[in-house]
Amino acid sequence: MTEGSSQDNSQGQVGEYVLDHEIGKGSFALVYRAHHISKPEQLVAVKSVVRQKLSPKLLENLEGEISILKSMRHTNIVDLRDCIYTDEHIHLMMEYCPGGDLSQYIRMHGNVAPWDGDAGANPLAAAQRSKFPHPEYGGLNEQMVRSFLAQLVSAVRFLRSKDIVHRDIKPQNLLLQIPDDECLASGHPPEIPLIKVADFGFAR
């Protein structure tokens, strides 16, 4: 964890990252996409928690989430890169998952918002439609659902091996990531997103 200056940067910078735009909002936090100041291609999601809005219990939950994520390294669990404390905020620098969450994916029948990038198109969309087409009248492709479930089981089993119970597994807390080279080498289909379990505020 990193101690920041007593004031948050007025130019939209947190630590070594420049805030690009807001990608999410909660009752006591905003989430931004951000890029590294000297490596623009290096993206993170910055969860900026307003200290004044935290009750003692919420602060305890947040500190518990930070502690758990610092000790977790698994393909299907979102990665915490750093944590920066200022007088007004607690900033969690998280792995950036451009595919949004599973609830959006289900609601939009697989047609998720475009992955970030100048190309402006989801690189998985066309391949998914051709190789793993979703049912015409609702629902998701069976093979894709099986993959999502297998990935979730892998994450939950890992958490149980660490005596951790998430306690808030739901589609909104399952983020979608583009498969990396390591996953592809292990046989993960390139057309199917990786599931990343997020939001450990209620975990014990």
Describe each model-derived feature in a short phrase.
Residues 30:
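Conserved N-lobe ATP-binding subsite of Hanks-type protein kinase domains
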Residues 35-43:
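Conserved N-lobe loop of protein kinases adjacent to the ATP-binding glycine-rich P-loop
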Residues 43, 48-72:
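Conserved N-lobe beta3->alphaC-helix segment of eukaryotic protein kinase catalytic domains
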Residues 83:
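Activation-segment/catalytic-loop signature of the eukaryotic protein kinase fold
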Residues 88-101, 105:
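Conserved short submotifs of the Hanks-type protein kinase catalytic core
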Residues 148-149:
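Activation segment signature within eukaryotic-like protein kinase domains
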Residues 152-164:
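Protein kinase catalytic-loop region centered on the HRD/HxD motif
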